Each structure stands twice: as C-alpha cells, then as structure tokens.
Design a protein with these regions (language model features):
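Nucleic-acid endonuclease domains
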Residues: 1-67, 72, 80-189
C-alpha cells in the first residue's frame, strides 16, 4: 500500500525539530530553488520527504494547470507543513491546500493524497532579520516575524480516491473550498 509505505518512510526522516537557519542553509547547499522562501518549513519538509521517497520507492513530481504537486508514484500526493498556532499563540485549525481546479483534476485522474506535517512554530524577529539578509532582501526592517523553528507534532495522511469522496469531505466540513485567487497576470487560476 503506497500510503503505508510513504508514512513509514516519512516517520523515519522527519526531524524532531527544524531549525530555520540550519534548514535554509541545507536547502541552499542542496541547490533547492525554494531556499529563499519565507515559509521555509514547508519547502524543507517537501525537500527531505521527496529526497527520501525517491531514494526508497521512486517517484516524481507533477504539474496540473499552474499547480505543482509534490510527489507522484502510483498516485498524486501534495505535502504541506501546517503551523498549529499563529504568531499570537492562537490555535490554527485550517490548512490551505492547492488550487481547486488542479485538485479536482488530480482526484479525477488517480485520486489525491494530502501529507500534512503539523508543528509548533517559534516566531522570532532576529531570525527574520537574518533570513532577509541571507536571501539578499535589503536592510529595511521586516514587516512581520518569520518562524525561527518548527517542531513537528503530527504527521497526517489523507487520500481522496474520487469525486464522491471529495464531495463527501466538503459536505461534512472536512474540506472547504476557498475563493480561488488569480494568477499574476490577473486571469483566474
């Protein structure tokens, strides 16, 4: 079972704590194009997960419309790192997933799995300044704090096999369709 194999591999590779500076430096050294991203914890999770999954069971990535899905073997999988609380220490229960059209297409084609790593973030302005300088973002004061660290609390894997399961998840409130944004050229996603 692909889901079980993914879970076993990821349980072994996810670190007990993700330090922002260490992870960003590792991503840069590995040539990962997302090392400058402010949501480094999600891109770091994707990088280490894909690397280990590809090494142990093979796989690739897939692009549907304008959306990249993180891992594909027999099924399409999307990975997310979700913070269990915001900067004010309030619990955050919603995790934003991918574009609705691409999600529906992936479900139609093969089914779609969501791999969600939930963790407790530590927000820190000193790290934010370091990150901005490291990525070459100028010297003006950053507007909001970034996550200095991310401590994994739970790995959850969900699989939606078809449109019927998607509709059931939406009607039960397990999934919610948000208003869809626009691309940089102003056209709908």
């Amino acid at each position: 079972n692909e889901l079980v194999a993914i879970a076993r591999i990821l349980e072994r590779v996810i670190p007990a704590e993700m330090d922002g500076e260490t992870c960003v430096r590792e991503m840069r050294a590995a040539g990962d194009s997302n090392w400058k991203q402010v949501q480094w914890q999600g891109f770091y999770f994707e990088m280490i997960a894909r690397r280990e999954l590809n090494k142990q069971i093979g796989g690739t990535r897939q692009r549907l419309f304008n959306t990249d899905f993180d891992y594909v073997r027999n099924f399409v999988w999307d990975m997310k790192a979700h913070s269990s609380e915001n900067e004010r220490g309030q619990a955050t229960n919603e995790c934003i997933l991918n574009d609705a059209r691409a999600t529906e297409k992936a479900i139609e084609d093969s089914g779609l799995g969501f791999i969600i790593l939930t963790g407790k973030p530590l927000y820190d302005m000193e790290f934010t300044r370091w990150h901005k300088a490291f990525r070459g973002g100028g010297t003006d004061e950053p507007g909001r704090k970034l996550k200095k660290s991310f401590t994994p609390e739970a790995l959850e894997i969900f699989f939606v096999k078809d449109r019927t399961e998607l509709e059931s998840a939406v009607s039960s409130g397990a999934l919610k369709i948000l208003s869809q944004g626009k691309n940089s050229n102003g056209k709908p996603r």
